[in-house]
């Protein structure tokens, strides 16, 4: 069997549709999806198998990255550094741009990225044929910069095989790097954490999802059930009250929504216990971000 394998960094501005694209390619719910921008915070590896036209069985390891943005908050700096690291580690990049975005995001990407890349134009199902053609024409002035330009729709599964074919074309022949049926090397507890975060985006408005995070305190895997004990961190007591809701109605909705998604992904029953705490300025403190896994502790000599 002829095989290829390689790491591909998936880059884009917040809300370009990166996580939706990956979940569609995987036919599974692993990456956090929200209609709100900048939901993804940590890099995730998603493994997509694909047989190309030349007969190669390719293992494409996507590095799902936080959206490219510049903010002074320490958490946002950590997110940007993860995206930059992914670009450095990958042999190929895919820059995903919404058909409705201007070219500034891509121009910023060109200043940051030294790797060969494919430009993918997303959400074409939400634009007219004329609008799509116009945007493709606008990007043509950068044709010397990208390897290929692929218009696509993750929601409608349009041109996804075209994208995978383009990626496989530029990967080197190699033995597979992961087991055949593995979709991600993420631990289940980390996937569950992201599912809880997604539920926060689903049920809470305004700034609360952006000023909150989730810590898994205890995770017990049993044959027929996973037991998850977690707490939701917010910055203000007023936010804590909103997350809990009157008579606990909001936290129940968040918990039920998250638990059902966990059971779908884990393919077994899940017991979920959620608590809420207020911790002022957690997103600006290095110790808090270390505990949450956004900053790795420096090794002492």
UniProtKB/Swiss-Prot annotation:
Region (G3): 64-67
G4: annotated segments: 122-125
InterPro entries (UniProt xref): G_ERA_dom (IPR030388), GTP-bd (IPR006073), GTPase_Era-like (IPR005662), KH_dom-like_a/b (IPR015946), KH_dom_type_2 (IPR004044), KH_sf_prok-type (IPR009019), P-loop_NTPase (IPR027417), Small_GTP-bd (IPR005225)
UniProt region (G1), positions on chain: 12-19
Ranges where the Era-type G domain occurs: 4-173
Protein name: GTPase Era
Gene Ontology terms describing biological process: ribosomal small subunit assembly
An MF annotation (GO) of this entry: ribosomal small subunit binding
Taxonomy of the source species: Bacteria, Pseudomonadati, Campylobacterota, Epsilonproteobacteria, Campylobacterales
UniProt KW Isomerase keyword: no
């Amino acid at each position: 069997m002829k095989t290829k394998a390689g790491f591909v960094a998936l880059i884009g501005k917040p809300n370009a549709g990166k996580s939706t694209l990956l979940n569609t390619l995987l036919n599974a719910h692993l990456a956090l999806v929200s209609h709100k921008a900048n939901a993804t915070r940590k890099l995730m590896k998603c493994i997509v198998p694909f047989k190309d036209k030349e007969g190669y069985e390719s293992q494409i390891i996507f590095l799902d990255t936080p959206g490219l943005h510049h903010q002074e908050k320490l958490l946002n700096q950590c997110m940007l550094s993860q995206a930059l690291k992914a670009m450095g580690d990958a042999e190929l990049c895919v820059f995903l741009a919404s058909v409705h975005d201007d070219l500034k995001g891509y121009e910023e990407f060109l200043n940051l990225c030294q790797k060969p890349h494919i430009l993918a134009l997303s959400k074409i199902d939400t634009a007219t044929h004329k609008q799509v053609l116009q945007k493709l024409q606008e990007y043509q002035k950068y044709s010397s910069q990208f390897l290929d330009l692929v218009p696509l729709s993750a929601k409608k599964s349009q041109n996804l095989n075209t994208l995978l074919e383009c990626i496989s074309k530029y990967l080197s022949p190699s033995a597979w790097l992961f087991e055949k049926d593995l979709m991600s090397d993420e631990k289940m507890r980390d996937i569950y954490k992201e599912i809880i975060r997604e539920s926060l985006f689903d049920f809470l408005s305004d700034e609360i999802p952006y000023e909150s995070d989730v810590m898994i305190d205890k995770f017990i895997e049993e044959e027929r059930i996973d037991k998850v004990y977690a707490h939701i961190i917010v910055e203000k007591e007023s936010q804590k009250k909103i997350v809990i809701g009157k008579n606990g109605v909001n936290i129940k909705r968040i918990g039920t929504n998250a638990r059902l998604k966990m059971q779908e992904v884990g393919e077994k029953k899940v017991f979920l216990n959620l608590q809420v705490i207020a911790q002022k300025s957690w997103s600006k403190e290095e110790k808090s971000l270390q505990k949450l896994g956004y900053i790795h502790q420096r090794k002492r000599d």
